[in-house]
């Protein structure tokens, strides 16, 4: 009885391509938790800044604070409006990611950068207006602003690396 050999090219099957499954835990955290909580946080902050309740603990409340420092009202109204826009941006980004839409990862990166930029603009305006009233920022405040910027940029880099490896999945 002759042995059949699998070395015959006719008997060989093409090698199956193995597609490496990438873990999606960070993705799930983003779409089911982080972006939703970010939107809620932005709306909450927008409410506090638009109503002046952010200064509720000040003597005389918001009215007393704004009477003494009227320029802060304009900054807070701008920041409150930005909070509403950022909340909508977070929700939109979440649904684009969840739907695996083309360009959704780059949209998330734009959201990350926009968040950092809006926060830094607020703090720069706050520092500038404070200086016009003779109040200089403390070293602790400056360090906290630098830390916020650093954390925001680190978060951006993590997302860039994570979604750079998964960009091919977002093709709808």
What function would you assign to each model-found segment?
Residues 2-172:
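Topology signature of small-to-medium multi-pass alpha-helical membrane proteins
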């Amino acid at each position: 009885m002759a042995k059949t050999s699998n070395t015959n090219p006719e008997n060989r099957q093409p090698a199956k391509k193995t597609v490496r499954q990438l873990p999606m835990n960070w993705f799930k955290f983003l779409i089911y938790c982080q972006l939703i909580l970010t939107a809620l946080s932005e709306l909450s902050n927008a409410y506090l800044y638009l109503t002046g309740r952010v200064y509720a603990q000040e003597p005389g409340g918001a009215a007393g604070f704004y009477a003494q420092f009227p320029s802060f009202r304009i900054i807070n109204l701008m920041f409150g409006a930005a909070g509403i826009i950022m909340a909508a941006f977070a929700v939109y980004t979440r649904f684009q990611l969840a739907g695996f839409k083309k360009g959704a990862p780059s949209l998330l990166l734009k959201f990350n950068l926009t968040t950092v930029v809006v926060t830094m603009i607020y703090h720069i305006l706050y520092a500038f207006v404070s200086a016009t009233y003779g109040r200089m920022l403390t070293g602790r405040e400056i360090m906290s602003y630098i830390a916020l910027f650093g954390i925001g940029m680190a978060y951006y880099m993590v997302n860039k690396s994570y979604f750079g490896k998964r960009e091919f999945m977002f093709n709808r």
